[in-house]
Each structure stands twice: as C-alpha cells, then as structure tokens.
Amino acid sequence: PVVIGATQKAGCMGAAYEFLFNIEKWLREQHIRKKVDLYWITPEDYLGHFGIDGMPGGETMLKGFMKIFHIHYRKQVAVEEVMADGVKLNTGEVISSKFVMLMPPFTGVDFIRNSPALEALPNGFLDVEGTYQHKKYKNVWAAGLTVDVPAPFTSKKVPYAVPKTGYPSDETGKIVAENIVRIARGK
C-alpha cells in the first residue's frame, strides 16, 4: 500500500494532490497499479478545499477521480504517527504502507525564530500590517512564506492552512516593493 497526503496544519494541498495523481499514473505505466492499494489522507473538510475554500465543482471532480482511479481517501484526519509499516490517524485507524509521502505544514525559517526582537509567532511567521510592514519595526518588511496569512475559513475538525506557493509569494514581494518605493517618495 501507498499513502499520500497532507498533515494537520499543512497548507499546500495542491502539490500533494499532484503527487498522488502522478504516482497513480506511474503505477499504471509500470503495470502494477492493480497490485497497489493507494490512499489519500487529508485534514481538509472536503476533497478539493485546497486551503482556499475550494473551487466550483472541485469536490465533485475529485470524488470522481478517486472513484475512477480506485483511490481510497480519508478526509478530516490528522496524522498521529508514521511507522515503518504504516500511518496511524487520529481516528485510531492504521493504514499499512510500504511508501508514504506527506505534505508537512510550512513553518518559519530559523533566522526569524532566532531573532527574538522580530517577535515571530509560534509557527515562525511574522505578523505584519496590510502593507507587509512589521507591526513594531517600520523598517522591517516581510513577503512570501515569512508572512503569517490568516485563513479566510475555519477548519471543522482538523486544522489546515492556506497555500503559500510561488504566485502569492511573488505578489507579496511586488506589494512590498511598491510600498517601500511609496514611502521612500514620501507618499
């Protein structure tokens, strides 16, 4: 058996879904798919939430893919333990496995955590103003993964986060640059 998924507090479900369907395809190409039980585990309240409160038709589409490709899935679950031969979920279920790939939560980098003056949140991210300026130090700016992004939703059973991928990081970087230029010009 193969277990693919995302752990509690993870925020990059898309990459894990992509890995799931890539490995499913690879197993078919190797002519061994019928011999391998494939499991998807996720803290999401529903398939296709992606940490963005879903997309129109996403849940229906993913349920269809899970059925077509014979993928077992568990939603609203947390990982309690990864063992040599399985994954234990918070429900008490143990899914045996020979291979596991789990997307962990994003956390802040060590230099932020090791800089007490920056007052990082417990997850290692910085709490910033809407301009991406530090709330206390106006000469400190943050963008991308460094920024704490509050979720625009409430997880029902198991916590998970918003995605922090390349595009949002790129966009916050541009906003920071524009705000620095604006302030430097006295606007």
Where are these regions (language model features)?
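FAD-site-proximal beta/loop scaffold in flavoenzymes
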Residues: 1, 96-99, 103-171
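Rossmann-like NAD(P)H-binding beta-loop-alpha module
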Residues: 1-36
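Cofactor-binding loop segments of dinucleotide-utilizing enzymes, especially the Rossmann-like FAD-
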Residues: 7, 43-45, 145
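Amphipathic alpha-helical segments in well-structured domains
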Residues: 16-20, 59, 125, 166-169
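A Rossmann-like FAD-binding core segment of flavoenzymes
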Residues: 25-128
